[in-house]
């Protein structure tokens, strides 16, 4: 590609509204342009990268035995009513009606559509296993789109759906897709981790996320120092302490704490260890509890894991905190002074709190706390659950090593849906005995456009993007110095361009009438892995200059050897 016939669209300055590095560099490198909130046009440079991600994903998913299809972005609302997700998805599911007042949605995912297709097209176990996928535009009406294409309303996604006659078949399909994901991300040159995850709104049982490791990641992942165990912070189990509860050494006393509204203030003002405090949080209860709200009790230095909490049968899902008015009406005190002693509402205790003794907690009276509280003496220990998020140094749930935490960007997710959708939509086939059997489903997604942004988050420097070679918009750049003043420079550049393109290499030939400094900055910004600089001075000595973007190195290469040198770099 010649830059004179190409839309380069690079920017010198970083736009003010770009918060993360990938958003900044995608704008500056001329990859995307904002159309509206969460909506982006992909310019030629960005589209080249997007297509490379798509092609790698397509090849590996094909190799896993999946078959490509293409489904509509517009879906009938009635399909979503069949599974009950029409309300579960909330306002992120964009609804509209056509001219005949028929309700539709813009697709954020396609479980309903694919299940409807399979129940009409597949009728025998002999047609299984079946795995269908598409690479298609999706739409999710995000409340707060941010970070460019990382959290956009419209995005490109690969979504696949497997159908099997039994759970054993589902496990095989799931494992095949897991391995295909690993091969795809390996080929892309990304540092990533597959981690155990919560199934969320998609539903089902087994679930793993694939995270690209990056400091800007919105998710925390926990992994063992001594094994392959890794889990999203939402899923990582906090084991019960190995120590037994110590015997009481203090009597329970009531202490005036008028200025201690938070755990931090209580610790600072009264000189107690934060590990000896508990905090009591109130959330809306589910129908399984004979109360409107329920208390969740965790250690003062721990954080409530909201996903773990809302997965409990006693807690309303999605999680909803009780408001101040409810607390005062039911308990007579406000947040900051609440605790389990004398509480006439149900409560659940975290594992770490269950082994505490001589601890401090709110007295359910404004401005007062109990010190020296002990279970089964001052308050009965009730239901115990894992309520907290893990912290660095916790024992790994696998029994090997301790947990470390890193930030990650979720780029893929695989689910064992089981019969959650197929049963709701009556998707079954005749088995070997001639009986109707509801199909076991798997669901698999890769955020193709998000992969592009996450690769940049992981691969950049002060000059711009440093693409993994498999994703770069161009593999080689040719920069002829003062080409329009030197016939031999132009001739050498044209010859090299023809040779490399004939070999199937993506080449950007910078034939602009620009200063060399401008050319070099653009090529570094775009992140082209290999650059060949052609100039009169080097040609006088029979050489070209070769630059490697990732190594940030320069070499002088004989003109006769330049093609072989580039081939060696690419092999």
UniProtKB/Swiss-Prot annotation:
Catalyzed reactions per annotation: tRNA(Pro) + L-proline + ATP = L-prolyl-tRNA(Pro) + AMP + diphosphate
Primary localisation category: cytoplasm
Cell compartment(s), UniProt: Cytoplasm
One GO cellular component term: cytosol
Single annotated GO MF: proline-tRNA ligase activity
Family matches, as InterPro entries: aa-tRNA-synt_IIb (IPR002314), aa-tRNA-synth_II (IPR006195), aa-tRNA-synth_II/BPL/LPL (IPR045864), Anticodon-bd (IPR004154), Anticodon-bd_dom_sf (IPR036621), Pro-tRNA-ligase_IIa (IPR002316), Pro-tRNA-synth_IIa_bac-type (IPR004500), Pro-tRNA-Synthase_IIa_type1 (IPR023717)
GO biological process: prolyl-tRNA aminoacylation
CDD domains xrefs: ProRS-INS, ProRS_anticodon_short, ProRS_core_prok
Domain remark text: Consists of three domains: the N-terminal catalytic domain, the editing domain and the C-terminal anticodon-binding domain.
Family note: Belongs to the class-II aminoacyl-tRNA synthetase family. ProS type 1 subfamily.
PANTHER family for the chain: MITOCHONDRIAL RIBOSOME PROTEIN L39/PROLYL-TRNA LIGASE FAMILY MEMBER (PTHR42753), PROLINE--TRNA LIGASE (PTHR42753:SF2)
Complex and partners: Homodimer.
Protein's recorded name: Proline--tRNA ligase
Species, as recorded: Aliivibrio salmonicida (strain LFI1238) (Vibrio salmonicida (strain LFI1238))
């Amino acid at each position: 590609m010649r830059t004179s016939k190409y839309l380069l669209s690079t920017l010198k300055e970083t736009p003010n509204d770009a918060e993360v590095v990938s958003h900044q560099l995608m704008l500056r490198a001329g990859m995307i342009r904002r159309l509206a909130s969460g909506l982006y046009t992909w310019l030629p440079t960005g589209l080249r990268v997007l297509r490379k991600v798509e092609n790698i994903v397509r090849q590996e998913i094909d190799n896993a035995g999946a078959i490509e299809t293409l489904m509509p972005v517009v879906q009938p609302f009635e399909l979503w009513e069949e599974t009950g997700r029409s309300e579960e998805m909330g306002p992120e599911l964009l609804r509209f009606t056509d001219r005949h007042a028929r309700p539709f949605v813009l697709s954020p995912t396609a479980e309903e559509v694919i299940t409807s297709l399979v129940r009409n097209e597949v009728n025998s176990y002999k047609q299984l296993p079946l795995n269908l996928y598409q690479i298609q535009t999706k739409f999710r009406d995000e409340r707060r789109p941010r970070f460019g294409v990382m959290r956009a309303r419209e995005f490109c996604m690969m979504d696949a759906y497997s159908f099997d006659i039994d759970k054993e078949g589902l496990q095989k399909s799931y494992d095949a897709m897991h391995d295909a994901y690993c091969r795809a991300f390996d080929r892309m040159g990304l540092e990533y981790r597959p981690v155990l995850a919560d199934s969320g709104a998609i539903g089902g049982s087994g679930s793993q996320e694939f995270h690209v490791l990056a400091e800007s990641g919105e998710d925390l992942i926990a992994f063992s120092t001594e094994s392959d165990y890794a889990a999203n912070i939402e899923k990582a189990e906090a084991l019960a302490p190995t120590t037994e509860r110590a015997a009481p050494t203090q009597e329970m006393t009531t202490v005036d704490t008028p200025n201690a509204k938070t755990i931090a203030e209580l610790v600072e003002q009264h000189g107690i260890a934060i590990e000896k405090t508990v905090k009591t949080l109130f959330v809306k209860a589910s129908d399984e509890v004979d109360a409107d709200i329920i208390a969740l009790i965790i250690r003062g230095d721990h954080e409530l894991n909201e996903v773990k909490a809302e997965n409990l049968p006693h807690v309303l899902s999605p999680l909803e905190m009780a408001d101040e008015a409810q607390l005062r009406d039911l308990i007579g005190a406000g947040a900051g002074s609440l605790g389990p002693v004398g509480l006439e509402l149900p409560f659940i205790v975290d594992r770490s709190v269950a082994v505490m003794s001589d601890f401090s907690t709110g007295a359910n009276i404004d401005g007062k706390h109990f010190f020296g509280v002990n279970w089964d003496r001052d308050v009965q220990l009730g239901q115990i659950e894992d309520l907290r998020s893990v912290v660095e140094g916790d024992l790994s749930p696998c029994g090997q090593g301790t947990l470390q935490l890193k930030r990650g960007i979720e780029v893929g997710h695989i689910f064992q849906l089981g019969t959650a959708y197929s049963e709701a939509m009556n998707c079954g086939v005749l088995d070997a005995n001639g009986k109707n059997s509801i199909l076991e489903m798997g669901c698999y997604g890769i955020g193709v456009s998000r992969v592009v942004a996450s690769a940049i988050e992981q691969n950049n420097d002060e000059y711009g993007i440093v693409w993994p070679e498999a994703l770069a918009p161009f593999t080689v750049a040719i920069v002829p110095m003062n080409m329009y003043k030197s016939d031999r420079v132009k001739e050498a550049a044209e010859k090299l361009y023809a040779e490399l393109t004939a070999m199937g290499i993506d080449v950007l030939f910078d034939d602009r009438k620009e200063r060399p400094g401008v050319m070099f900055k653009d090529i570094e910004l775009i992140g082209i892995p290999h650059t060949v600089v052609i100039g009169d001075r080097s040609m006088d000595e029979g050489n070209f200059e070769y630059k490697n973007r990732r190594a940030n190195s320069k070499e002088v290469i004989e003109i006769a050897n330049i093609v072989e040198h580039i081939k060696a770099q690419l092999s």
